[in-house]
């Protein structure tokens, strides 16, 4: 198996494993489990390709909530003209760097765009809802990272990355950055496991918008006033298991996935009355979905 094909497949699955753990697509078999896959020269992953799909996820009503809502989400991932299109929660990120053939280490960098709907809709708690809905944020920023290929065997990868983004719609009007680490390994030609850990750091504008309780909000909801400050507000751990229905990711087609995610609110993200009095610092979510690659 050429090393370049391993790199292409790891880039494919790593790009799909970042949707907070996001969607992933299966990769190649571990030699120790299945033996090397037969040579192929027609892999869809070695040329322009697009994956589209849909999933359903049970997630907290807002960040810090102990109520859950069922939400559908779209999936878009691809590679067009040498540019990788990778999913983000509520948006996409582009990787403008071309991987080197057979490289042990690859780099990624490019812009990202997304929206944030935290407390902008579907607030189940009546007290939090009485404090008022917030505006949708539109976030622009950049993403960059490094991926180490062939860490424990020929087909796995370990990635370190960071996103930084700013709200440009005048909602929280601040900055967020998130470092993360992820590990992707295939267990068979059709079965992939990805695990991820990340943390989030927010500035004062973000903290005040989402975590503070103003006098007006206190009067409307009965919650005590609270003045939030920036800092680390969340850590996240997730895993995803993906199964390719044809038995080989390289021929495209349909794949299904199951994901689970654990988050813990920190500092003022946990101390705000929206979490401490009306919610829970422990945040759980899980989902299923299907995607098609062509």
Predicted regions mapped to residue ranges:
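Cleavable N-terminal export/targeting peptides
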Residues: 1-46
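Short loop/turn motifs that connect adjacent beta-strands in outer-membrane beta-barrel proteins
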Residues: 31, 38-49, 64, 83-107, ...
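Residues that define the transmembrane beta-barrel architecture of outer-membrane proteins
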Residues: 48, 68-74, 105, 134-140, ...
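Transmembrane beta-barrel strands of outer-membrane/channel proteins
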Residues: 50-58, 87-89, 111-115, 160-166, ...
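Membrane-embedded beta-strands of outer-membrane beta-barrel proteins
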Residues: 52, 74-76, 94, 142-144, ...
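Flexible, solvent-exposed coil segments and beta strand-coil junctions
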Residues: 52-57, 77, 120-126, 156-163, ...
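Extracellular loop and loop/strand-boundary signature of outer-membrane beta-barrel proteins
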Residues: 60-62, 95-97, 126-131, 164-168, ...
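Outer-membrane beta-barrel transmembrane domain signature
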Residues: 82, 146-148, 167-255, 262-270, ...
């Amino acid at each position: 198996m050429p090393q370049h094909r391993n790199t292409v497949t790891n880039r494919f699955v790593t790009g799909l494993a970042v949707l907070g753990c996001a969607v992933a697509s299966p990769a190649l078999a571990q030699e120790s489990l299945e033996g090397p896959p037969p040579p192929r020269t027609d892999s869809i992953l070695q040329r322009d390709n697009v994956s589209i799909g849909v999933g359903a996820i049970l997630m907290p009503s807002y960040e810090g909530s102990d109520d859950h809502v069922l939400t559908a989400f779209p999936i878009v991932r691809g590679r067009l003209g040498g540019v990788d299109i990778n999913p983000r929660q509520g948006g996409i990120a582009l990787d403008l760097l071309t991987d080197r053939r057979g490289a042990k280490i690859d780099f990624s960098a490019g812009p990202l765009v997304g929206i944030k709907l935290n407390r902008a809709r579907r607030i189940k708690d009546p007290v939090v809802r009485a404090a008022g809905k917030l505006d949708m944020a539109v976030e622009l920023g950049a993403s960059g990272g490094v991926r180490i290929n062939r860490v424990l065997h020929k087909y796995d990868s370990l990635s370190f990355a960071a996103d930084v983004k700013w709200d440009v719609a005048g909602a929280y009007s601040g900055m967020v950055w998130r470092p993360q680490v992820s590990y992707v390994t295939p267990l068979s030609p059709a079965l992939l496991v990805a695990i991820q850990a990340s943390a989030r750091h927010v500035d004062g504008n973000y903290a005040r918008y989402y975590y503070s309780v103003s006098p007006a909000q206190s009067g409307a909801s009965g919650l005590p006033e609270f003045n939030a400050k920036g800092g680390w507000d969340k850590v996240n751990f997730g895993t995803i298991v993906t199964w390719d229905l044809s038995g080989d990711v390289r021929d495209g087609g349909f794949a299904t996935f199951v994901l689970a995610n654990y988050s813990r609110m920190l500092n003022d993200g946990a101390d705000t009355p929206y979490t401490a009095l009306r919610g829970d610092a422990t945040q759980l979510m899980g989902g299923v979905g299907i995607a098609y690659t062509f």
